A protein has these predicted regions:
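Short beta->alpha junction loops
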Residues: 168-171
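Conserved "HGTGT" condensation-loop signature of ketosynthase/thiolase-family condensing enzymes
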Residues: 1-166
Length: 171
């Protein structure tokens, strides 16, 4: 390609590698095989009780090591696995990418399990005040990193050797 911009002078983007995780599986091959075979990734929701909900099925990814460890851990595992697959497919190493990192991530929040853990760390007060009292205890320090907006992108940037400040976009 002799020209690196399109007719409106925008940079041309070429996809050279792809990484995929869906409720059907991990990797482009597993997903393509499942889709081609007509399999569905829709199944009963198991992450939380659905007794009083109208929707009880979903296409959740609940088979990864981090699937029950909260949204930040799951987001990191999915991003790391898909980036590794995409870089391998593109023929690039995964330790010195050399380019910028742009990450689309879900909102950063504590899982309900984590909130209940923080609440149980204290016996002082009630409600939100008790949760906050638990959150400042030394044994709660691990929750801090997982709830920082850019922490997942920072870890990915370190893992893949990207350049510049990583950028995270969230809904």
């Amino acid at each position: 390609m002799s020209k690196m911009t399109d007719h409106l002078d925008r940079p041309v983007v070429v996809v050279t590698g792809l990484g995929v995780i869906t409720s059907l599986g991990v990797g482009t091959k597993d997903n393509w095989d499942a889709l081609s075979a007509g399999r569905s990734g829709i199944h009963p929701i198991r992450r939380f009780p659905t007794d009083d909900l109208k929707t009880r099925i979903s296409g959740t990814v609940d088979f990864l090591d981090s699937s029950d460890k909260g949204p930040s851990a799951l987001t990191y595992e999915m991003a790391e696995a898909t980036a590794t697959e995409a870089l391998a497919e593109a023929g690039l190493g995964d330790g010195d990418f050399g380019g910028p990192l742009f990450l689309a991530a879900p909102p950063v929040e504590l899982s309900w399990r984590d909130r209940f853990d923080l609440y149980r760390m204290s016996t002082e007060g009630a409600g939100y005040r008790r949760l906050l009292t638990g959150a400042v205890k030394p044994e709660a320090s691990g929750y801090y990193e997982t709830t920082q907006f850019g922490s997942i992108a920072d870890r990915l940037a370190d893992r893949f050797g990207t350049r510049g400040l990583p950028i995270t976009l969230s809904t």
